[in-house]
Amino acid sequence: MAAEREPPPLGDGKPTDFEDLEDGEDLFTSTVSTLESSPSSPEPASLPAEDISANSNGPKPTEVGLDDDREDLFAEATEEVSLDSPEREPILSSEPSPAVTPVTPTTLIAPRIESKSMSAPVIFDRSREEIEEEANGDIFDIEIGVSDPEKVGDGMNAYMAYRVTTKTSLSMFSKSEFSVKRRFSDFLGLHSKLASKYLHVGYIVPPAPEKSIVGMTKVKVGKEDSSSTEFVEKRRAALERYLQRTVKHPTLLQDPDLRQFLESSELPRAVNTQALSGAGILRMVNKAADAVNKMTIKMNESDAWFEEKQQQFENLDQQLRKLHASVEALVCHRKELSANTAAFAKSAAMLGNSEDHTALSRALSQLAEVEEKIDQLHQEQAFADFYMFSELLSDYIRLIAAVKGVFDHRMKCWQKWEDAQITLLKKREAEAKMMVANKPDKIQQAKNEIREEIEEWEAKVQQGERDFEQISKTIRKEVGRFEKERVKDFKTVIIKYLESLVQTQQQLIKYWEAFLPEAKAIA
């Protein structure tokens, strides 16, 4: 067995751990000490071929009995691998071979793989097709942050301006780092432009945060309090997530309107973005009309994949809404718990001040301090519940609405194609009736007209079929990308959320363990 198997080559580029051994060290002290070998034999200082293969991922060698073949245990390894001899030529093949990476122990491979995954990709001048090919890995060297919310103006004419900072090495941008000031309506205008360009052809455009009339009215006319500050912070975080999702899309990243939004110091004011304007009311009417059309159109779905995905997103939407409501209730519960804990701490402190017993008074005062710290922990955990978990669910509820929107546009595209086919059929029937009519004076002119109309509608039918096939192909690709992003986002947020819970519980344990000696000291 051993004679038929050649040991794997050892690279001479890097010394292995065995070469660091001194001549006097015995490599197989625990195993070879029981063997009866000649003092001049180099077997104890040699590396057997079986031991080399045992460290690899290949098949395990047949187990050798020490009592049966003691003399042949190291017979094949005495000349191939010797730690005492610097020569390694005997273990190399005599046939010419291409350059091979030196074989290293398996324990040294893992750090190299980690270092490769940690290296940041360098992205320079790329075409749209190249960026779309990298969409599966979502490798885009661009970072976007929204910060420094600032109130501009007074009264009902006031608005909030946000600083949008971009850092990138993509050559499509004029600078590697730049920042601009944008108001909320600018974000809505950007989404409106992108949706009008890409939504009807099957691209999933990330939705912008919804406009809140009540919240913004408080910010405009009210003083700065905790509720208005919390509203501004929620909106800032939502705008940042919106831009980050938008620039992750390989097609949207190439759009000139997006680049203008990120780079241009002066941006034309977005129009038709107000909720109570005429355009806002028109959008509401159009949404209602689309809902009615969706109920009346009966599409003969021939693709089982689309039927399955539509049902999947309907169920996912319902479950996300239920979970979001539960998390919102959890956030309210933690805030209420924080308020009750603060009230308890205040009462314990007052009781400690009125207590005559020194040890008990000190213990009550310490208990009040612990409860104040726990109150702070409950507040921090409530923020984590909201900003990590609740906002993620809220974002994906809107994203699923965008996904359902592209499915609706596919249905509209099919309806347009179907209408063109029906019209073409009617034109051909009219031509057939004209051919059997006994009016030779008018038949030639009418025949030419109807033939032109038939050719026109034939072209429309062909175009409708191409559009339907193209939007179906795009939606398949977009849904696959959406699913990958969804799993990645949920994994990241769940891990961070669990880490915050663990950290909170560990801090609680520390607080109570520190207070326990004070309670035991009461005498």
Curated annotation (Swiss-Prot):
One of its GO terms (cellular component) is cytosol. The keyword Transferase does not apply. Keywords: Acetylation, Cell projection, Endosome, Lipid-binding, Membrane, Phosphoprotein, Protein transport, Transport. Residues 27-50, 93-104 have a biased composition (Low complexity). One of its GO terms (molecular function) is phosphatidylinositol binding. The modification Phosphothreonine is found at residues 101, 104. CDD domains: PX_SNX2 (cd07282). The modification Phosphoserine is found at residues 97, 117, 119, 185, 277. GO terms for biological process: early endosome to Golgi transport; intracellular protein transport; lamellipodium morphogenesis; retrograde transport, endosome to Golgi. Its main location: membrane. It is found in: Early endosome membrane; Cell projection, Lamellipodium. It is a peripheral membrane protein. InterPro entries: AH/BAR_dom_sf, PX_dom, PX_dom_sf, SNX2_PX, Sorting_nexin_N, Vps5_C. Gene3D superfamilies: Arfaptin homology (AH) domain/BAR domain, Phox-like domain. A 1,2-diacyl-sn-glycero-3-phospho-(1D-myo-inositol-3-phosphate) binds at residues 183, 185, 211, 235. The modification N6-acetyllysine is found at residue 473. Residues 278-295 are annotated as: Membrane-binding amphipathic helix. Residues 140-269 form the PX domain. SUPFAM superfamilies: BAR/IMD domain-like (SSF103657), PX domain (SSF64268). Residues 260-523 are annotated as: Interaction with RhoG. Predominantly forms heterodimers with BAR domain-containing sorting nexins SNX5, SNX6 and SNX32; can self-associate to form homodimers. The heterodimers are proposed to self-assemble into helical arrays on the membrane to stabilize and expand local membrane curvature underlying endosomal tubule formation. The BAR domain is able to sense membrane curvature upon dimerization. Membrane remodeling seems to implicate insertion of a N-terminal amphipathic helix (AH) in the membrane. Belongs to the sorting nexin family. Involved in several stages of intracellular trafficking. Interacts with membranes containing phosphatidylinositol 3-phosphate (PtdIns(3P)) or phosphatidylinositol 3,5-bisphosphate (PtdIns(3,5)P2). Acts in part as component of the retromer membrane-deforming SNX-BAR subcomplex. The SNX-BAR retromer mediates retrograde transport of cargo proteins from endosomes to the trans-Golgi network (TGN) and is involved in endosome-to-plasma membrane transport for cargo protein recycling. This is Sorting nexin-2. It comes from Macaca fascicularis (Crab-eating macaque). The gene is SNX2.
